[in-house]
Amino acid sequence: MSSQVSSPVRVRFAPSPTGYLHVGGARTALFNWLYARHVGGTLVLRIEDTDLERSTPEMVEGILVGMRWLGLNWDEGPYYQTQRMDLYKAAAEKLVASGHAYYCFCSKEGLEQRRKAATAAGRAPQYDESCRKIGREDAAARKQGGAPCAVRFAVPETGNTKFQDAVFGEVEFANPELEDFVLLRSDGVPTYHLSVVVDDVDMKISHILRGADHISNTPKQVLLYQAMGATLPIFAHVPLILGPDKTRLSKRHGATSVISYSDEGIVPEAFRNFLALLGWTAPEGSPEKLGDEELIKLFSLEGISHSNAVFDRPKLDWFNTEYIRAYPAEKLLPLIQKEWQKVGLTPANPDAQHLVATIELLKPRARNLKDFAGSFKAFFTDDYANDPEAVEKFLKDPAVREMLVELGERYANAGEFTEQSTEQVLRDLAAEKGVKAGGLINGARVALTGQAVAPSLFAVMVNLGREKTVSRLRRAKEIQ
C-alpha cells in the first residue's frame, strides 16, 4: 500500500459544527489553505455534521463566517456529511461483505457492564469481540430478522499498523491495542472513522493536515484505507496549541472563538500571520511579519514543528499594531466604519478625505480597530467621555482651566491656524503666565481629546479645525 500520492494535491478542512471556529481549527484551516496555495492544489471544505444532537445551523454559519473573516477561501464545498449518509452505509455493508467488518448485536447496557467488569479485573476496557465469533450467515439472518445492530471493523489480531507522518516520521501501533471499533451505529449514523475515510477517498484527498490529537485515530483509519483498497494519503499532524501555562488552550486563557478576535479589533492579516507561526517556522532569515504572498511562498510541511505551540496574546497584539500602522488609511476606513456601526457612532464630519487624514494621524497609536470607536472617539464626534484619571491629573488646577479658556480665545482671533502657529500661541501664553508650556499642552490635550495620550497636540488641533478646537477649549472649566 503506497503512501506517496501523486499530484494533483487536494487537501481539506473538515470542522464539526458543534461549536464556533476556534483557534486550533482556524490554524488547521490556515495550514491547509497555505499548503494548497503553495503547491497550486485544491482546498475542500467539508462540514462533519453527523453529530445530530450537537450540530446546529448556527454553528455551521459561525464556521463559515470565521473562515470568510480570516480570508481563507475554499475551492470546493462546503460538503455536508448528513447529505452523504447513503455512502457511509454502503461502505459499511461492503466491508461486512468483504470480511473486514461484522455486525454487532451487543446492547449499550451490556457493553457498559462488560467494560466495568474488565476495568475491575485490571484489564483494558476494550470490546471483547463476542459478536465477531458469530457466523456470517447467522449474523445476516439476525439482522434480517430485525435485530438492532451496529457494524464493527475487524482489527487484525496480530501485527502492527504503521504510517509515515510528514511531521513525526514513522508512527506504529500494535494491532492488539486497537479494539474492534464501531463503523456504523445501530441507528444508522456513521462514526467519525468511517465517514472521514469514505469522504477522503471519495473526494480524492491527497494530504491530511490536522491536529496531533488525531494521531491515535490514524491507525484505525489506515486499516480502513487498506480494507477499502484505497491509496493512503500523506498525513501531517500539526502540534497542539497551548496556553501560556503550557496546558491545552481553553476559554480560561481568554477568547478561543475566531470571531471574538474580530470583535476585539484584530485585523485578519495580523491574525493569519500570528496563526501561521503557531507550529510552523519560516526559513532562517525570514522576518516575523509575513504577508499572504510571503507565507504562501515559504510554507512547507518540512517547516511544521514537532513541539506544541504556545498562544502568546501580547505577540498577537504586536502583530495587530504592526499591520494597522502599515495599512493605508483608505483600507482601514471601511473596517473602522464597522466599529462605528457597532457603537452607533456617526462621524460629525463624514467627508471621506477628512476621515482618511484623521485615521492617518491616529493609526501609529492604535492597538486595535476598537480604539477608533473608543479612545479616539473625540476625533470623530462630540459625544465622547473624558478619562477621569487624565482630568484629575492634568485639569485639577483651576488656573490651568482658566488659561485653556484664554487659549481658546486667542486661537479664535489668530490669523493662521497651522501646527506652527498654534504651538507659538500656546508657548507665548505660557511665557506670559510664567508657567511651563508642558502643563498647558497636557491640559489642552485632555480638553480636546478626553485622553492623556494622543498624537502631537498641534497636529490634533489642525485636524479638529479652528472652530472645534476653540469650542472645546472654551468649555475647559466645565470638564468633569
UniProtKB/Swiss-Prot annotation:
EC primary class: ligase
UniProt protein name: Glutamate--tRNA ligase 2
HAMAP family: Glu_tRNA_synth_type1
InterPro entries per the UniProt record, alphabetical: aa-tRNA-synth_I_cd-bd, aa-tRNA-synth_I_codon-bd_sub2, aa-tRNA-synth_I_CS, aa_tRNA-synth_I_cd-bd_sf, Glu-tRNA-ligase_bac/mito, Glu/Gln-tRNA-synth, Glu/Gln-tRNA-synth_Ib_cat-dom, GluQ/Sye
Assembly, per entry: Monomer.
Placement of sequence motif 'KMSKS' region: 248-252
Residue runs in coiled coils: none
First-listed, main subcellular location of the protein, grouped into a coarse class: cytoplasm
Any one GO MF annotation of this record: glutamate-tRNA ligase activity
GO biological process: glutamyl-tRNA aminoacylation
EC number per UniProt: 6.1.1.17
Similarity comment text for this entry: Belongs to the class-I aminoacyl-tRNA synthetase family. Glutamate--tRNA ligase type 1 subfamily.
GO cellular component, one term: cytosol
Catalysed reaction equations from the record: tRNA(Glu) + L-glutamate + ATP = L-glutamyl-tRNA(Glu) + AMP + diphosphate
Function statement: Catalyzes the attachment of glutamate to tRNA(Glu) in a two-step reaction: glutamate is first activated by ATP to form Glu-AMP and then transferred to the acceptor end of tRNA(Glu).
Keywords: Aminoacyl-tRNA synthetase, ATP-binding, Cytoplasm, Ligase, Nucleotide-binding, Protein biosynthesis
Residue window of motif 'HIGH' region: 15-25
SUPFAM superfamilies: An anticodon-binding domain of class I aminoacyl-tRNA synthetases, Nucleotidylyl transferase
